């Protein structure tokens, strides 16, 4: 496949970036700029904020998010593998078996280390 086949994609990306920058610039130039304390305060259910809007999150939230992404990617690899299993044969089956075994070992490791405990 030659690079000429990707030329429409490049044009589409350039057009999207230019259009996005143009629309944001027009909004910045033509939009009203009247800041006041009520507009700059964080909104919380119709009341004044009880605490600072930027609270520290527990590290466990990030850990759960990273684990979700990892296992979501695992699922993203499993679907095409399942569709193409007849064409790829035993080598593909063994490769996915090793891949799944690594994930299972990693999951058991983080479970035994207590990374999934919320106490």
Curated annotation (Swiss-Prot):
GO terms for cellular component: NADH dehydrogenase complex; plasma membrane. It is found in: Cell inner membrane. It catalyses: a quinone + NADH + 5 H(+)(in) = a quinol + NAD(+) + 4 H(+)(out). The keyword NAD applies. The chain crosses the membrane at residues 7-27, 63-83, 88-108. Coiled coil: none annotated. It is a multi-pass membrane protein. Its main location: membrane. GO terms for molecular function: NADH dehydrogenase (ubiquinone) activity; NADH:ubiquinone reductase (non-electrogenic) activity; quinone binding. Keywords: Cell inner membrane, Cell membrane, Membrane, NAD, Quinone, Translocase, Transmembrane, Transmembrane helix, Transport, Ubiquinone. The keyword Heme does not apply. It is an enzyme of class 7 (translocase). Pfam families: Oxidored_q4. Its EC number is 7.1.1.-. InterPro entries: NAD(P)H_OxRDtase_bac/plastid, NADH_UbQ/plastoQ_OxRdtase_su3, NDAH_ubi_oxred_su3_sf. NDH-1 is composed of 14 different subunits. Subunits NuoA, H, J, K, L, M, N constitute the membrane sector of the complex. PANTHER family: NADH-UBIQUINONE OXIDOREDUCTASE CHAIN 3 (PTHR11058:SF9). This is NADH-quinone oxidoreductase subunit A.
